[in-house]
Amino acid sequence: MGKTMFKKTLLFFTALFFAALCAFSANADVIITGTRVIYPAGQKNVIVKLENNDDSAALVQAWIDNGNPNADPKYTKTPFVITPPVARVEAKSGQSLRITFTGSEPLPDDRESLFYFNLLDIPPKPDAAFLAKHGSFMQIAIRSRLKLFYRPAKLSMDSRDAMKKVVFKATPEGVLVDNQTPYYMNYIGLLHQNKPAKNVKMVAPFSQAVFEAKGVRSGDKLKWVLVNDYGADQEGEAIAQ
């Protein structure tokens, strides 16, 4: 029931003059190790590791946004810096990026804060022989976007206990998910009588969300799946209230 937890957005860099003459390539050669980043408060920095599986070097650009996927990296302000923000990743090699919390923006100390780590994989420009053969070309960069959770040091419970504290309530619309914990609960599935609920999504700390399902009554058994700290599917059960 696993899902890839990061989104890939295609960004077009060069103009296409005639489609019939165009050569096309869109491979994500630089891979991020992991599907989420957790930044524990008080830690000097965290490392994001990259791997380039291609036979040629790649150029990558990294930045962090605060929830707007369309924000221009040049004007996005968050309390983090990435070193280096632009890096060359050699063929069949790896690269480490360092994320450091600057403290430039005060964050709540009683709950997690959510940001997004972005990586743009920019493919190399074709060589002279390729250009001579094909003429014009379309170059595509692939963007990966991962959740970054800033986690305060002294929360009221740990993340494993928090999963068990979420309350599920039967409503006419389906299931009201009441997350009165300091953690984001990244749900990816909810079953009622072996039927999947709709509108399943991440529920922020100390907030609620409705997952759409028909005929849910108090006392019914529910099965849920969420993504845990390690990026793995975590399954559990609950009784609707």
UniProtKB/Swiss-Prot annotation:
PROSITE patterns: PILI_CHAPERONE
Cited Gene3D superfamilies: Immunoglobulins (2.60.40.10)
Compartment(s) where it occurs, according to its Swiss-Prot or TrEMBL record: Periplasm
Segment forming the signal sequence: 1-27
Record keywords, A-Z: Chaperone, Fimbrium biogenesis, Immunoglobulin domain, Periplasm, Signal
Single GO cellular component term: outer membrane-bounded periplasmic space
GO biological process: cell wall organization; chaperone-mediated protein folding
InterPro entries the UniProt entry points to: Ig-like_fold, PapD-like_sf, Periplasmic_pilus_chap, Pili_assmbl_chap_C_dom_sf, Pili_assmbl_chaperone_bac, Pili_assmbl_chaperone_C, Pili_assmbl_chaperone_CS, Pili_assmbl_chaperone_N
Record's keyword annotation contains Chaperone: yes
Function recorded in the entry: Mediates assembly of pili by forming soluble multimeric complexes with pili subunits as an intermediate step in the assembly process. This protein is involved in type B pili (HifA) assembly.
Record family assignment: Belongs to the periplasmic pilus chaperone family.
Entry protein name: Chaperone protein HifB
Species this protein is from: Haemophilus influenzae
